[in-house]
Every structure is written in C-alpha cells, then in structure tokens.
From Swiss-Prot:
Protein name: Bifunctional protein FolD
InterPro entries: Aminoacid_DH-like_N_sf, NAD(P)-bd_dom_sf, THF_DH/CycHdrlase, THF_DH/CycHdrlase_cat_dom, THF_DH/CycHdrlase_NAD-bd_dom
E.C. designation(s): 1.5.1.5, 3.5.4.9
The keyword Chloroplast belongs to this UniProt entry's keyword annotation: no
Keywords, comma-separated and alphabetical: Amino-acid biosynthesis, Histidine biosynthesis, Hydrolase, Methionine biosynthesis, Multifunctional enzyme, NADP, One-carbon metabolism, Oxidoreductase, Purine biosynthesis
CDD domains: NAD_bind_m-THF_DH_Cyclohyd (cd01080)
Domain of life, per lineage: Bacteria
Length: 282
C-alpha cells in the first residue's frame, strides 16, 4: 500500500517562518501583509480554495480581504476592483480565483493585475519571468506540486514525468518547473491518444484535469508518485481527479484531496505576500 503525502505537514515549517515574520513586524509596529482575494460567481472549487486561504491567513496573522462578485458582472466591473487593489498601498497581494464565468474575458482581466502584487503568477509578465528563468513569484499550485515531490527526497533528475492537463494555471507552469528540475516531461490533454499507455509509463504523474475520480489504477505505473491537483465538488464533497481508493495500493506515494496539494498551495500564496511586502519596502 502506498504512502500518503501530507501537504499539511510539509506546510508546517513554512507556516512557522511566516508567523515569525508577521509577529516581528507587529512587535515593531510595521505593516503586516494583506491579501485581497476576488471571487466571481459560485464555482465550488474556488469557494473552497478562498475559504482555505482565509482560514490559513487568519491563523498566521496575515490580513485577508474577500471580494465576492455576482456571476453576471462585466469585465469592467472586475477590472475596476483590480485597479482599486493595485492602488491600495495596504494590499501586497491580489489573488483572482479562476476559472472565471465563461462570459468574462479572462486574459483581459488578468492583464490588469499589477505584476508587483501578482502573487500567483497569473499575468503575462509574471509568466514570462517564469519561463525565462528570471526572478519573480512562482505560481503557488505548481510550486506546491514540486515542493511536495521534493519533500520525499526523490531525485527528480531524469525521471519520466507526465502532466495530465495543459492549463495556464497548473499544467504548463508545473511542466516548466519540473523541466527546471531536469525531469523528462510529457504533457497530456484531451486530444492525447493512448492516454492510459502514456500515463502508465510515468515515474511521477501529476493530474490536473478537473474530472472527479477520473484516474484509476489502470493509468498508474507500479510504485509511481501520484500528485492529484484536482478539486471538484462531487456528491457534496471536495474530490480530486484521482480515484484514491483504487490508486493507493499501486502508487508508492499519493496526495489526498483535501489535505494534499491545496493544503500547501495556500501557505505558499501567503508566503508570496510576505515576499511582496519585502519587495515593496526595498
């Protein structure tokens, strides 16, 4: 039986560092980090993620501002909120919950986030820095994936890694981060032929497709490391893309949902807000 990768445990050390940073600033009567998180509509995964952000931020002493907009808002409505946050010196990080409702122009809206406050690496400029290897905020979910793999003391160099999903939020950036670790990376998507065959060759399988319990044991190589990035609402519960019960006996390591990638992602987001505050003051 495989072992569970506990994202909460991996996050603990980082949380202690954040706590110390915030407490020192409070003791010296200095500004503390503040995150503004924007949610448009009622996507189940986004609501869950925002709630997690707020809970962790509060526990670490970081200010958290929720901005919840109706699903029928316009592009300009969302952009106006972003502009207000760009101009607010008390806000160090802006988090836009994705996906947005389909009638909104996601690229147009993301473009308006200040790169200095883009703590989840959503803007074109931030992503350009990622792909060119320049200093900038790392995208939190992809960074969480790589951090969890590294926590296993596994040498990623030369490993066959399959990333299932090609979104700009997870698939593409996590592939880039793994390339930076010298992995041999294959990206699969809805048009990939022989999907089971490709996935079953992976030493490390990263799944981010938004299909609850889609991946079963037939997609898994014996003793593979499986990282489940999915968070979907399924039968009233938050569920991953991997059928946990069917895969745990075949994988060597597997992240649970919840308690895996998401548990660390939120902590890394808050860490980025602390870094943004340092950059602002330098």
């Amino acid at each position: 039986m495989g072992q569970i990768i506990n994202g909460k445990e991996v996050a603990l050390k980082i949380k202690e560092e954040i706590k110390t940073f915030v407490e020192e600033r409070k003791n010296n009567k200095l500004r503390i980090p503040k995150i503004a998180s924007i949610l448009v509509g009622n996507d189940g995964g986004s609501i869950y993620y925002m709630s997690s952000q707020e809970k962790v931020a509060n526990s670490l002493g970081v200010d958290f501002l929720k901005i919840i907009l109706e699903e029928n808002v316009t592009d300009d409505d969302v952009i106006n909120e972003i502009h207000k946050l760009n101009d607010d010196v008390n806000v160090q990080g802006i988090m836009l919950q994705l996906p947005l409702p389909k009638h909104l122009n996601e690229k147009k809206i993301i473009k308006e986030i200040s790169v200095k406050k883009d703590i989840d690496c959503l803007t074109f400029e931030s992503q350009g820095k990622l792909y060119m290897g320049e200093k900038g905020f790392l995208p939190c979910t992809p960074n969480s994936v790589v951090t969890l793999i590294k926590s296993l003391n596994v040498d990623i160099t030369g490993k066959e890694v399959v990333v299932l999903g090609r979104s700009n939020i997870v698939g593409k950036p996590v592939a880039q981060l793994l390339l930076n670790e010298n992995a041999t990376v294959t990206i699969c998507h809805s048009k990939t032929k022989n999907l089971k065959e490709v996935c079953s060759k992976a030493d490390i399988l990263v799944v981010a497709i938004g299909k609850p319990k889609f991946i079963d044991e037939e997609y898994i190589k014996e003793n593979a490391i499986v990282i489940d990035v999915g968070t979907s609402s399924f039968e009233g519960k938050i569920t991953g893309d991997v059928n946990f019960d069917k895969v745990i006996d075949k994988a060597s390591f597997l992240t649970p949902v919840p308690g895996g990638v998401g548990a660390l992602t939120t902590t890394l987001l808050i860490k980025n807000s602390c870094e943004a505050l340092k950059e602002y003051e330098d």
